[in-house]
């Protein structure tokens, strides 16, 4: 199914407000996931409170941003301007999944199930392949590789030209981003919890990787030249400037939207360190108590008897 961007005019303020994109697949997926989360949240709230309302609100914010990234002017102009496409990729890969994970969907779904369903979820989380897929290193590699593969292979042009590739690509971006934040933040139920120090170390390497990709797109050859030339766009920036702006969106704006993630990582690391300190203090107190009970008195045996102690002292 070939995509027809239509006779879009220049990207003005009026176009931002008035332009909407018909993306039935994204609309169906968003409606299905939002309905499922809302249903599970209501069912879980009747028995216990799995998540706070603010956390559920974060999931709703993620859904709204997903709508904006696919059904608003971004969804339309992503087929015409390179930098708008970069903005869409950034939102689907980073921003939308970040808010979705804050809603703790795994916890919400588990709380809505019965005892048998919860056991199945627990067994699934305890499986070996779940620990491998949800490992911080695995999800970080997928997060780092996806933009490189998208922009530096024919995948980018194919996703623009065919909706059979474009629709799964948009969904895949959200899935990869969700797995990344799910494994790194560990705010939801996860197969295994790792030290947040690992995530901070991984973030250093990711910053370098994102920066190099931005430089490659900025200084490298033009991407999808035949596709953009075939649109015959007579307004807006030229192809080189368009791609330069897109590189800035992916690089600079990507670092800006990543600041809340880093702050949450540091907060989680501080929380883990405090919990570890409590455990260590408890172990030290237990060891000290055991030593005091089994310790041999350093004084002579008769010094523990008041009468003998006074007699020997007078003598």
Regions found by a protein language model. Give the residues of each.
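Alpha-helical membrane segments of multi-pass proteins
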Residues: 1-315
């Amino acid at each position: 199914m070939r995509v027809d961007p239509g006779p879009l005019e220049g990207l003005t303020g009026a176009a931002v407000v008035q332009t909407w994109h018909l993306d039935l697949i994204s609309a169906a997926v968003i409606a299905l996931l939002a309905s499922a989360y809302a249903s599970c949240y209501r069912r879980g709230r009747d028995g216990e409170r799995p998540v706070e309302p603010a956390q559920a609100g974060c999931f709703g914010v993620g859904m709204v941003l997903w709508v904006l990234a696919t059904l608003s002017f971004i969804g339309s102009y992503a087929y015409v301007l390179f930098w708008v496409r970069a903005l869409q990729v950034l939102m689907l890969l980073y921003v939308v999944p970040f808010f979705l994970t804050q809603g703790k969907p795994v916890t919400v779904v588990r709380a809505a199930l019965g005892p048998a369903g919860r056991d199945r979820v627990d067994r699934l989380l305890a499986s070996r392949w779940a620990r491998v897929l949800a490992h911080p290193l695995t999800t970080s590699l997928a997060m780092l590789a996806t933009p490189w593969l998208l922009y530096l292979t024919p995948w980018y042009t194919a996703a623009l030209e065919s909706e059979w590739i474009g629709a799964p690509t948009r969904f895949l971006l959200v899935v990869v981003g969700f797995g990344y934040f799910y494994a790194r933040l560990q705010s939801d139920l996860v197969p295994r919890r790792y030290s947040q120090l690992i995530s901070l170390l991984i973030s250093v390497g990711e910053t370098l990787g994102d920066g190099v990709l931005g430089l490659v797109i900025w200084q490298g050859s033009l991407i999808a030249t035949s596709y953009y030339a075939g649109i015959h766009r007579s307004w807006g920036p030229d192809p080189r400037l368009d791609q330069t702006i897109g590189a800035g969106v992916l690089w600079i704006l990507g670092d800006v939207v990543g600041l809340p993630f880093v702050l949450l990582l540091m907060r989680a690391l501080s929380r883990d360190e405090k919990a570890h300190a409590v455990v260590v203090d408890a172990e030290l107190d237990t060891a000290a108590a055991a030593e005091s009970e089994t310790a041999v008195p350093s004084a002579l045996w008769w010094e523990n008897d008041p009468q003998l102690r006074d007699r020997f002292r007078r003598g």
